[in-house]
Amino acid sequence: MEAKAVGKHLRISARKARLVADEVRGYDYKEAIDILRFTNKAASSMIINLLNSAVANAIQMNESLDPNSLFVKKIYVDDGPIMKRFRPRARGRASRIRKRLSHITVVVSEIEKKVS
């Protein structure tokens, strides 16, 4: 069983968010939260919220599910729209500032137990 959480229009560049997302891909839920909690990046708090939301969605689908039996199956960061702002420069000119947004998707799944 899979559960998904999507964060859209998050105010961080996709390039910076991918650095953090790549750190937790494949880890189980508890370990991923521990890694993110000690990662000193702005994207880590956003990904923690999305990971908690994905786990809550999984529990919503199956009440008897243990959160510790979930792992991060997929996590990916896509580019969002770009907010364009202008900064005044010398001689009456202006420079464009591009504030980048991103969409982050987290998919959690149950750890499959091996039957022997």
UniProtKB/Swiss-Prot annotation:
Biological role stated in the UniProt entry: This protein binds specifically to 23S rRNA; its binding is stimulated by other ribosomal proteins, e.g. L4, L17, and L20. It is important during the early stages of 50S assembly. It makes multiple contacts with different domains of the 23S rRNA in the assembled 50S subunit and ribosome. The globular domain of the protein is located near the polypeptide exit tunnel on the outside of the subunit, while an extended beta-hairpin is found that lines the wall of the exit tunnel in the center of the 70S ribosome.
GO cellular component, one term: cytosolic large ribosomal subunit
Subunit organization: Part of the 50S ribosomal subunit.
GO biological process terms on file: translation
Gene3D superfamilies reported in the protein's UniProt record: Ribosomal protein L22/L17 (3.90.470.10)
PROSITE patterns: RIBOSOMAL_L22
Domain of life from the UniProt record: Bacteria
Protein's UniProt name: Large ribosomal subunit protein uL22
Keyword Ribosomal protein: yes
Keywords linked to the UniProt accession: Ribonucleoprotein, Ribosomal protein, RNA-binding, rRNA-binding
Taxonomic lineage from the root: Bacteria, Pseudomonadati, Spirochaetota, Spirochaetia, Leptospirales
InterPro entries, sorted: Ribosomal_uL22, Ribosomal_uL22_bac/chlpt-type, Ribosomal_uL22_bac/org-type, Ribosomal_uL22_CS, Ribosomal_uL22_sf
Native source organism of the sequence: Leptospira biflexa serovar Patoc (strain Patoc 1 / Ames)
A matching Pfam family: Ribosomal_L22
GO molecular function, a single term: rRNA binding
Stated family: Belongs to the universal ribosomal protein uL22 family.
